[in-house]
């Protein structure tokens, strides 16, 4: 089956610190996005890779491995995350794509096994996404004080890539009013069933300064350093 990967990297998040959005900050000598793109370019069965960028980042994006050679296609994002994803989905219309993976550009440590596991789940459901069960105690707070606890039974921390049958998720995005937290929310609003796939703790989203140090340690371990 023909599969495309959409890497969403149009955000301007600054919680990681620094002068650049987190996906453009250096990680082990390369931009975070370079690691993310490498994972999908190496993934089995992915025939097209689209990188969704902010218009201001085009020059940076054109310098990434795979872009100049045409192996990574650039798509400009929209005013929100779901608008950015829809732009990429529309760019694939009529191309014969059957499955699509949608991934946060700031998750550079996604493993090929996780990509394969998520795609395999599409054999039994129109959508699939990795997640990790919540293991910590959960509190509710007000004014800096604990006011209650939350049962964590059945709660998961969502990850990406989130995989879908292409035509189904395209129709779901076209029908959605906007404002979704992720593509699973868009899919469920359209009545699509989404299978939960076993996620991975190492598949972190680099969001805060400490995340970069952890990601560098994991990359070093993977390289046997």
Swiss-Prot record:
UniProt key word Transferase: yes
The EC number(s) this enzyme carries: 2.7.7.60
UniProt KW keywords: Isoprene biosynthesis, Nucleotidyltransferase, Transferase
Uppermost EC category: transferase
Domain of life: Bacteria
Site (Transition state stabilizer) residue list: 15, 22
Site (Positions MEP for the nucleophilic attack): 152, 205
InterPro entries: IspD, IspD/TarI, IspD/TarI_cytidylyltransf_bact, ISPD_synthase_CS, Nucleotide-diphossugar_trans
One Gene Ontology biological process: isopentenyl diphosphate biosynthetic process, methylerythritol 4-phosphate pathway
SUPFAM superfamilies cross-referenced by the UniProt entry: Nucleotide-diphospho-sugar transferases (SSF53448)
Pathway noted in the entry: Isoprenoid biosynthesis; isopentenyl diphosphate biosynthesis via DXP pathway; isopentenyl diphosphate from 1-deoxy-D-xylulose 5-phosphate: step 2/6
Reactions performed catalytically: 2-C-methyl-D-erythritol 4-phosphate + CTP + H(+) = 4-CDP-2-C-methyl-D-erythritol + diphosphate
GO molecular function, a single term: 2-C-methyl-D-erythritol 4-phosphate cytidylyltransferase activity
Gene3D superfamilies linked to this entry: Spore Coat Polysaccharide Biosynthesis Protein SpsA, Chain A
Keyword Secreted included in the entry's annotation: no
Family membership: Belongs to the IspD/TarI cytidylyltransferase family. IspD subfamily.
Role this protein plays: Catalyzes the formation of 4-diphosphocytidyl-2-C-methyl-D-erythritol from CTP and 2-C-methyl-D-erythritol 4-phosphate (MEP).
Protein name: 2-C-methyl-D-erythritol 4-phosphate cytidylyltransferase
Organism listed in the record: Cereibacter sphaeroides (strain ATCC 17023 / DSM 158 / JCM 6121 / CCUG 31486 / LMG 2827 / NBRC 12203 / NCIMB 8253 / ATH 2.4.1.) (Rhodobacter sphaeroides)
Gene name for this UniProt entry: ispD
């Amino acid at each position: 089956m023909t599969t495309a990967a959409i890497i969403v990297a149009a955000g301007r998040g600054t919680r990681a610190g620094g002068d650049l959005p987190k996906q453009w900050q250096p990680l082990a000598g390369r931009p975070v996005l370079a690691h993310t793109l490498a994972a999908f370019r190496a993934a089995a069965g992915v025939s097209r890779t689209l990188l969704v960028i902010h218009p201001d980042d085009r020059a940076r994006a054109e310098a990434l491995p795979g872009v100049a050679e045409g192996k990574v296609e650039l798509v400009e994002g929209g005013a929100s995350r779901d608008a950015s994803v829809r732009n990429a989905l529309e760019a694939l219309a009529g191309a014969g794509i059957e499955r699509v993976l949608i991934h946060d550009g700031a998750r550079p440590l996604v493993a090929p096994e996780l990509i394969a596991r998520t795609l395999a789940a599409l054999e039994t459901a129109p959508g699939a996404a990795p997640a990790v069960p919540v293991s910590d105690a959960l509190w509710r707070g007000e004014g800096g004080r604990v006011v209650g606890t939350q049962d964590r039974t059945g709660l998961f921390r969502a990850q990406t890539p989130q995989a879908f049958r292409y035509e189904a998720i395209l129709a779901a995005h076209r029908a959605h009013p906007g404002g979704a937290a992720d593509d699973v929310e868009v899919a469920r609003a359209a009545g699509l069933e989404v299978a939960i796939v076993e996620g991975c703790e190492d598949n972190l989203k680099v969001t805060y300064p400490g995340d970069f140090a952890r990601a560098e340690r994991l990359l070093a371990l993977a390289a046997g350093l």
